[in-house]
């Protein structure tokens, strides 16, 4: 007589298990749906940060499941597939951290660890503030605006400032490059003629180098002329 225990669930047991945990499954799927659908930096920073945490957790979870699959493979083919997938997950996770750390060294912003993008926008205001924001790619043009004394860029709230605080150059950093944008146009004033209430700026991509933002911040006042 075999001492092995059959741990396979039949259909009825699966149905009973689903009935017992269906409320938890519903709540979990609803949570993921809300996070993935509404998790944008332009909508809600809180939900967006939750989305980043969920995405961060996926890689370790994938690696853990892959290791378990390697320990308990269904057959030889399954073992080979599990090893390949686990190695790929580990390399991808390590690659993410390498690129994020390189980007952090370049721009000194926690947005560097954003798993959705490998680029960070940065505006060094003339009043000493550094405003960093998430950006999905490196655009040809950036158009920050000031509305009611608040600076926005790419739809994200950055800081309270005045039109005179915007510098001549702003930056978009990637792990291996610093993209420099030069101000080419500036529009100030609303319909009432209030120049401090509303302003639009147009920055065009000027050049690319391998410098860091720290070298710009300590390089003198030429940045703001």
UniProtKB/Swiss-Prot annotation:
The chain crosses the membrane at residues 21-41, 52-72, 78-98. Homomultimer. Interacts with envelope E protein in the budding compartment of the host cell, which is located between endoplasmic reticulum and the Golgi complex. Forms a complex with HE and S proteins. Interacts with nucleocapsid N protein. This interaction probably participates in RNA packaging into the virus. The keyword Transmembrane helix applies. It comes from Avian infectious bronchitis virus (strain M41) (IBV). This is Membrane protein. It is a multi-pass membrane protein. Residues 42-51, 99-225 are intravirion. Keywords: Glycoprotein, Host Golgi apparatus, Host membrane, Membrane, Transmembrane, Transmembrane helix, Viral envelope protein, Viral matrix protein, Virion. Belongs to the gammacoronaviruses M protein family. It is found in: Virion membrane; Host Golgi apparatus membrane. GO terms for molecular function: structural constituent of virion. One of its GO terms (cellular component) is viral envelope. It holds the Pfam family CoV_M.
């Amino acid at each position: 007589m075999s001492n092995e225990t059959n741990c396979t669930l039949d259909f009825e047991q699966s149905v009973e298990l689903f009935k017992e945990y269906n409320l938890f499954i519903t709540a979990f799927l609803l949570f993921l749906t809300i996070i993935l659908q509404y998790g944008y930096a332009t909508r809600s920073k809180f939900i967006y940060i939750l989305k980043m945490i969920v995405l961060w957790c996926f890689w370790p979870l994938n690696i853990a499941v892959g290791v378990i699959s390697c320990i308990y493979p269904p057959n030889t083919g399954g073992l080979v597939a599990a090893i390949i997938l686990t190695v790929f997950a580990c390399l991808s996770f390590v690659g993410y951290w390498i690129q994020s750390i390189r980007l952090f060294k370049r721009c000194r912003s926690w947005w560097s660890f954003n798993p959705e993008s490998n680029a960070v926008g940065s505006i060094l205001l003339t009043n000493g503030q550094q405003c960093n924001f998430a950006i999905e790619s490196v655009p040809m043009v950036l158009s920050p605006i000031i509305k009611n004394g608040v600076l926005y860029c790419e739809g994200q709230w950055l800081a309270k400032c005045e039109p005179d605080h915007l510098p001549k150059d702003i930056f978009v950093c990637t792990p291996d490059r610093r993209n420099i944008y030069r101000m080419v146009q500036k529009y100030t004033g609303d319909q009432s003629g209030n120049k401090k209430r509303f302003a639009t700026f147009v920055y065009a991509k000027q050049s690319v180098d391998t410098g860091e933002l720290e070298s710009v911040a300590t390089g003198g006042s030429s940045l703001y002329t």
